[in-house]
Amino acid sequence: TIYKGLLIVAADNPGGGWLAALNRDTGETVWLKKRPAIATYASPIVFDVGGRDQLIIAGCDQVVSYDPNTGEQIWSVDGTTEACVGTVVRYGDLVYATGGYPGQETICIDAGTGKVVWRNDKKSYVPSLLQYDGYLYVVDDSGIAICWNAETGEEQWKQRIGGNFSASPILVGKNIIAIDESGKATVFKADPQGFERVAEQQLGDEAFATPSVSANRLYLRVAQRDGDMRQEVLYCIGRPDAEVIQAE
């Protein structure tokens, strides 16, 4: 994670974990904090929540907030599980974390107070959660899509879309795109009123990377197999006549 002049790196592992901030120009260690000796894989992220910038990371049976400038702990909450992969997401001053091994839990925390708002026994182990317009959308590892009210945790709907997922869902306009490990992309509406499938498309034979969007183009990295040969392929999808937005 890049924050101002810092590159913030997490290395949680059984040999002894740590969280560190490096000077982006020199690589010098600005601060370093020890973390539990547990393997977990979530990336840290900085949000302006609770009236200040907070560096938040999930895993090691906890969700912890640090001051990104100094590494000092702001708050810590017991929750999720040992191993988390998805990055924390936010809605206003609420932050959300989920983990799936060996236990499973999704938790909502008020970042201003460090207090738990709600929690459940559901999980998205590898894919990250997606927040849009006050609702959380989940496409879990086993291919079940869920919509929760972000403030209360109330389930709005649940739908099996099939497949196994490692890539995170992304929002494009008012649609959500999720691609499973076999390369099947499913598009459905980001609508708390109910699940509505918009389209499906097969792209390659394997997919583990999260799609990205830039300049009205959708980019997907997948793999194609031919016998024992495996070749990764990058797809760029968009209308040929669509206006390309130039980066400033």
Which sequence ranges carry the predicted segments?
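Noncatalytic, solvent-exposed loop/strand surfaces
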Residues: 1-248
